[in-house]
Structures are given as structure tokens and as C-alpha cells.
Amino acid sequence: MKVRTSVKKLCRNCKIVRRYNVVRVICKSEPKHKQRQG
């Protein structure tokens, strides 16, 4: 998982999710695209 100041969708399967006040990107097709804002 990458930790970034700004998270972006990297492909069309990426989804932006907000959990416990933390913005995350989850991606089923490409697990490398997982990101967390921090």
C-alpha cells in the first residue's frame, strides 16, 4: 500500500473509499494501486 498526500484513481477499477476519516483507494484488478492518504 502506498501512503500519499493526494490519492487518485489509477485505473477504471479503482474505488475511492473513506473509512474512519481516512481516504483510501481500493482496486480489485490491480492490488498495486492500493493507496492511503496520510
Swiss-Prot record:
Stored PROSITE patterns: RIBOSOMAL_L36
Keyword annotations: Ribonucleoprotein, Ribosomal protein
Example GO biological process: translation
Keyword Ribonucleoprotein (UniProt): yes
Transmembrane stretches, start-end: none
Pfam families (alphabetical): Ribosomal_L36 (PF00444)
GO cellular component: cytoplasm; ribonucleoprotein complex; ribosome
An example Gene Ontology molecular-function term: structural constituent of ribosome
Family: Belongs to the bacterial ribosomal protein bL36 family.
Protein's name in the database: Large ribosomal subunit protein bL36
Species assigned in the record: Buchnera aphidicola subsp. Baizongia pistaciae (strain Bp)
Highest classification ranks of the organism: Bacteria, Pseudomonadati, Pseudomonadota, Gammaproteobacteria, Enterobacterales
